[in-house]
Swiss-Prot record:
Pfam families with a match to the protein in the record: H2O2_YaaD (PF03883)
Residues annotated as transmembrane: none
Name of this chain's protein: UPF0246 protein APJL_0596
Species whose genome carries this gene: Actinobacillus pleuropneumoniae serotype 3 (strain JL03)
Family note: Belongs to the UPF0246 family.
Source species, domain of life: Bacteria
Lineage of the organism: Bacteria, Pseudomonadati, Pseudomonadota, Gammaproteobacteria, Pasteurellales
GO annotations of cellular component type: cytosol
């Protein structure tokens, strides 16, 4: 089983990563990342702010990040992706409290999609950046990052699936990031968990809760190491429960009553 998640805009490069007795890994697609960096380096703060719809302060920060980005990744200029990303999904995942065995399992069974890096293993080193997959960054391959990455992410996902031993892909990414995957080119059974929260008597997807729940589902996978879709249905973290009637063969619906 392979799970995919989105990255996060919020990063933490100040807190040291947990000290495990194994080495971090190198991101595989940095030659492509360098091409994107070279394009992004050409923008002024005002141009970058306009492209990304971010504040002047954030634009200046990211102009500096692009300028400082290096092709060589090491412990001095980079941090393992699993511990660098912060945000709602990663709050639910709570990576800092994973055991060594769970992190090693994640290295095989979890991937993060990324606008700059394409696809990251949890222990892949990454440098601070902001480049969302939906950014309309004109590049030699087209008008946006979906055109830039083309089949590359899908091919590397297929390789990861082949290496981990079965054909179940659990899509816990946002639509923006999953748009960079070409499911028709994957030899996979793609499962999409959906998390609905009760609001005023009706169940609906509430972004903040859904993101956190995706992270909790990743945590569940790392802790229980399921090998079948049936085992995924046992997910009950955060008071969610599986709704058989609302679910389909590839869409698993989990619901939670309104919180008091």
């Amino acid at each position: 089983m392979l799970a995919i998640i989105s990255p996060a805009k919020t990063l933490d490069f100040e807190t040291p990563a947990p000290n495990f007795p194994f080495a971090n890994s190198q991101p595989k697609l940095t030659a492509y990342s360098q091409q994107l960096i070279d394009i992004c380096k050409q923008f002024s703060p005002a141009e970058l702010g306009s492209l990304m719809s971010i504040s002047d302060k954030l634009a200046s920060l990211n102009v500096a990040r692009f300028a400082e980005w290096q092709l060589a990744h090491n412990e001095q200029n980079a941090k393992a992706a699993l511990f660098a990303f912060k945000g709602d999904v990663y709050t639910g995942l709570d990576a800092e409290t994973l055991t060594q065995a769970q992190v090693e399992y994640a290295q095989v069974h979890l991937r993060m999609l990324s606008g700059l890096y394409g696809l990251l293993k949890p222990l892949d080193l990454m440098q601070p950046y902001r480049l969302e997959m939906g950014t309309k960054l004109v590049n030699p391959k087209g008008k946006d990052l979906y055109a830039f990455w083309g089949d590359i992410i899908t091919q590397h996902l297929q390789t990861a699936m082949d290496e981990q031993g079965d054909n179940i892909l659990v899509n816990l990414a946002s639509d923006e990031y999953y748009g960079a995957v070409k499911p028709q080119k994957l030899q996979a059974t793609i499962i999409k968990p959906v998390f609905l929260d009760e609001k005023n008597g009706k169940f609906k997807q509430i972004s903040f809760y859904a993101k956190k729940a995706r992270g909790m589902m990743v945590r569940f996978i790392l802790e229980t190491q399921p090998t079948s879709v049936e085992q995924l249905k046992a997910f009950n973290y955060g008071s969610y429960w599986f709704d058989e009637d609302a679910s389909g063969a590839t869409e698993l619906v989990f619901k939670r009553e309104e919180q008091a």
